[in-house]
From Swiss-Prot:
The keyword Acyltransferase does not apply. This is Small ribosomal subunit protein bS16. Keywords: Ribonucleoprotein, Ribosomal protein. One of its GO terms (cellular component) is small ribosomal subunit. Disulfide bonds: none annotated. GO terms for biological process: translation. GO terms for molecular function: structural constituent of ribosome. InterPro entries: Ribosomal_bS16, Ribosomal_bS16_dom_sf. Belongs to the bacterial ribosomal protein bS16 family.
Amino acid sequence: MSVKIRLTRMGSKKKPFYRINVADSRAPRDGKFIETVGTYNPLVTEEQVTLKEERVLEWLSKGAQPSDTVRNLLSKAGVMKKFHESKLSK
């Protein structure tokens, strides 16, 4: 089972809001997921991202692959840097 960290679209027409979910790669975009680890709101002037950093780092260490967009969001939040530092310190 390949696990991905990806965005799930919520909100209404023309007003998207996304949840950052951990899901099986075979599940549909808005389908079954394992855990919600954050949210992303692209419509506010400053893109608003909230994350459960400990849970994201745990899933990354277990081998979960972030999607391209989620990888960019995690990089901006500094989570990917922490992950790489913890990986190198082992």
